[in-house]
Amino acid sequence: MSSSDARSRIRDRGYSEVPRDTSCPDGTIRTFQSLHSSELAVSADPLPPPPLPLQPPFGPSFYSSDTEEPAVAPDLKPVRRFVPDSWKNFFRGKKKDPEWDNPVSDIRYISDGVECSPPASPARANHHPYKDPSRGSQGTFNSQHEADAMFAHDPYASLDRRTQTARTYSEKVEEYNLRYAYMKSWAGLLRILGVVELLLGAGVFACVTAYIHKDNEWYNLFGYTQPYGMGGLGSLGNTYGGYYYSGPKTPFVLVVAGLAWITTIIILVLGMSMYYRTILLDSNWWPLTEFGVNVALFILYMAAAIVYVNDTNRGGLCYYPLFNTPMNAMFCRVEGGQIAAMIFLFVTMIVYLVSALVCLKLWRHEAARRHREFLEQQEINDPSLSSKRKMCEAAISDRQRDQEVNVKDLRTTTKMTPELLSGHIPPGHIPKPIVMPDYVAKYPVIQTDDDRERYKAVFQDQFSEYKELSAEVQAILRKFDELDTVMSRLPHHSENRQEHERISRIHEEFRKKKNDPSFLEKKERCDYLKNKLSHIKQRIQEYDKVMNWDTQGYP
């Protein structure tokens, strides 16, 4: 028998046979690791095929013939790289399919970021009692402890973990907004201004340094003293409001630009840290300190700009014909880079001033935030303060809303247009319900002539009632006005006790007359009829306006 037939028989037997016995003679349970290939039995349920090897075999085929030479594994040598792969991947960026570049040993069973159902674990597929067909019911496992002993070391435990699902576009946008929402605040505006200041400062430094050779030529020609023969010009300049010029001040401008650049980058890096957001913004002194730093840099840049502009005309010497000779013309000529440097200096000065103003705004904003958090903490500690605050805010909002209502405008009253408020709704605010009169729904817009005649009949029928009630109510109100005038003349404090009691009784009776239910009912009915008739009249006038009818004969 050849060796290939033996290997094929062993391979076929491994797929068609299952463990025959799982217990030792002493009654103990053995795991899969302790089972031997010789202890196999026939079963209706074959074992699942083993997983494919992670590394393919070497050679032309796995089962080669005996005549072929045995495959020899290549001599693998460790690869030593001067630059680590992590650094290369960082500078190389992302690839479309990075899995294809990984070695075979790095390929995992579960992909990252793909939403899929994890495969079922073949080790713990069945939790019901297992029966051995060769032994009947004696091979039943009823204990979970025995099952755990059978699967002591589960090689597929990693498959039970939950896979990481891919994020949707909305989740990415939400994460982006949460990450960069800080840049929308006043502190974020300061960081943006800091980046602008760094760019402008670098421009100032580059433009000023590009023409520093002119200073070298000045010192080579005139030295470190005033130009020869210009002493009189110096005194002449003092006479006409000038000042003494001893040489270029470019080093001062470079020192100011460098100092401001270093200070700005320190503040910018500090502002992007969590220490700035959690500790410094909660303090009272840091926004004012940042304001002082920006003001100081603004003053330094203003001084540097003035000094650099003064250097371009050599302290005013270029305006004198005695100095502005062909030999000295190169010192008075202003190059394009120098003009750019002056522009950068003044723009940077303005940006630092804007940063100082933003620091003041940030200081006020953070103070208001701390005060609001303090009030919320007090409300949590003392619930009575929260109820009082809500009642106060509701009363203020009601008072403001009552002041805006115009009682004299009957058209607004009849239309009953709901009030539209825009802005922040205070906590605890309870809106007032809108009471819609019945005649608004009962008498809609007139569509036909019959509706107009019906509205006209209702108007004429109830107009007489309104006239009677109105005359009666107006008469009572006139009497009340006269009594008010008489009551105002009565003394409020009398020395006689009986007279004081009599005046008090008169006041009490007068108050009862004013609050008489029958009078209040008549007054309410009169107001209702007035609004109803106004509504009906408005409907008739609207219809007549559309139909171009003359309604002057109607009341």
Curated annotation (Swiss-Prot):
Belongs to the ELL/occludin family. The modification Phosphothreonine is found at T163. This is MARVEL domain-containing protein 2. The lineage of its organism: Eukaryota, Metazoa, Chordata, Craniata, Vertebrata. Detected in small intestine, stomach and kidney, in epithelial cells. Detected in pancreas, retina and lung, and in stria vascularis, utricle and the organ of Conti in the inner ear (at protein level). Predominantly detected in small intestine, lung and kidney, with lower levels in liver, testis and brain. In colon, expressed in the entire crypts. Interacts with TJP1. Interacts with the ubiquitin ligase ITCH. Interacts (via C-terminal cytoplasmic domain) with LSR (via the cytoplasmic domain), ILDR1 and ILDR2; the interaction is required to recruit MARVELD2 to tricellular contacts. One of its GO terms (biological process) is establishment of endothelial barrier. The modification Phosphoserine is found at S117, S121, S158, S384. There is a cross-link at K408 (Glycyl lysine isopeptide (Lys-Gly) (interchain with G-Cter in ubiquitin)). SUPFAM superfamilies: occludin/ELL-like (SSF144292). It comes from Mus musculus (Mouse). Residues 521-545 form a coiled coil.
